[in-house]
Design a protein with these regions (language model features):
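Terminal, contiguous helix-loop blocks that mediate binding/assembly
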Residues: 1-199
Length: 199
């Protein structure tokens, strides 16, 4: 599945579709209106030995080399690895409490989201758990196996991008908002987060 639309490289979207495809290609940020350059990517996707990473890299280079629209974030996810990512995340989030997100890498602008870097969010949300170093190393290993390709420009429009793990995430607040109530229906929330403190 190639999600040629904005903000779809989130752990929540990927996890929801984990049993629907082998590879998932998407963007943590917005994608500019041109979208995927089909003339450059289709040769990679239609040959006998499909080269998904080559197609993703061609997309990144198309935007990165552009004079007036050199903004892009893109990832390729091996969906067979997401259950391991989920297991490692659940261990880290076993004592989860909502966190202050002001210093997290943000991938969204304006009224969209907000969406944050997945690995950084998990780190900040779990850094005080017992045996954190061992647990986070296991999480990092699982995530690195799942993200077979990622690339990002230093900025996306007015957003400075200091880090990008390849996936974004929603910050759970247990605040009872409409967005949170919808989030509670997703597989990722139900498989990962403690439920006792929901409003």
């Amino acid at each position: 599945i190639w999600m040629d639309c904005c903000y779809m490289a989130s752990i929540e979207c990927a996890y929801e579709l984990r049993n629907k495809c082998q590879w998932y290609i998407a963007y943590p940020t917005e994608i500019l209106s041109n979208g995927m350059p089909y003339n450059l990517t289709l040769p990679y996707l239609t040959k006998d030995n499909i080269d998904i990473v080559g197609a993703a890299d061609a997309t990144f280079n198309y935007f990165n080399d552009s004079y007036d629209s050199n903004y892009c974030t893109i990832s390729v996810v091996d969906m067979s690895q997401l259950n391991r990512v989920a297991e490692a995340t659940k261990v880290l989030m076993s004592t989860f409490k909502p966190i202050d997100t002001k210093d997290l890498q943000k991938f969204s602008r304006g009224s969209q989201g907000p969406y944050y870097d997945f690995a950084q969010y998990v780190y900040q949300a779990s850094v005080n758990t017992d045996n954190f170093s061992e647990k986070y190393a296991n999480f990092t290993s699982a995530l690195n196996n799942a993200i077979v390709y990622k690339n990002y420009t230093a900025k996306f429009l007015n957003l400075k991008i200091n880090q990008c793990s390849g996936l974004s995430t929603h910050a759970v607040m247990y605040d009872g908002s409409d967005n949170e109530k919808y989030y509670y229906t997703l597989d990722w929330f139900n498989d990962i987060y403690p439920k006792l403190e929901q409003n």
